[in-house]
């Protein structure tokens, strides 16, 4: 992509952000006019970020902060004002959060669902040992992508490749891969063990690829899909 097209793409993205911001503002104004703003809990989030040309990448599909990090803002009577929570959290935490706010009980089949109420997390001190997981298995990708956040550290593992480890606090742009530094060997091993205590990357990747192959076969094969566009 040449520089002129890149500028147009960035402008379009920022324009969409402004459009979203404007519409959120309209919603908040309406809530205030209806005199229900103070009693309303609002959760603002996104499903993924945007690489926006950084590292020569566009879209999502990676575990770098540009793609994997999202806004998560909660306003409501159950949450303190002007507070930033540094403990790593994930969208999986939204389900128990909503149930907690509404004082609802989980149905039996979902009693052991992952996640923790963000209200509880926000009211606790910074938990540097809390782990959150993200994974990606896009059809056609070279392998499954797995990411573990624990405190300030991020561990990225693409199946079949060497891991990447970043200290997000001191290296927010993720330029220094600590996995390449022998002095961080114990940290890398600890994060790898933490990831594998949650999930088996190789077996999950194999299962995802098997399902994708079956789906392709069911619709006529990869050539049929590519020719259809």
What are these regions, as identified by a protein language model?
Residues 2-16, 79-88, 102-109, 174-182:
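Active-site rim elements
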Residues 48-54, 80, 92-95, 100-168, ...:
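C-terminal cap/loop subdomain of S1 sulfatases and analogous C-terminal strand-loop tails that border
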Residues 1-4, 178-229:
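Long, internal low-complexity/basic segments
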Residues 39, 88, 109-112, 189:
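Non-catalytic, surface-exposed connector residues within folded enzymatic/regulatory domains
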Residues 29-83, 90:
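Histidine-centered active-site microenvironments of extracellular/periplasmic hydrolases
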Residues 1-40, 101, 197:
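A long, amphipathic alpha-helix that forms part
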Residues 17-20, 24, 41-46, 72-73, ...:
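Beta-strand elements within well-structured catalytic alpha/beta cores of enzymes
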Residues 32-36, 106-107, 185-186:
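Structural helix-adjacent loops and short alpha-helical linkers that scaffold large soluble proteins
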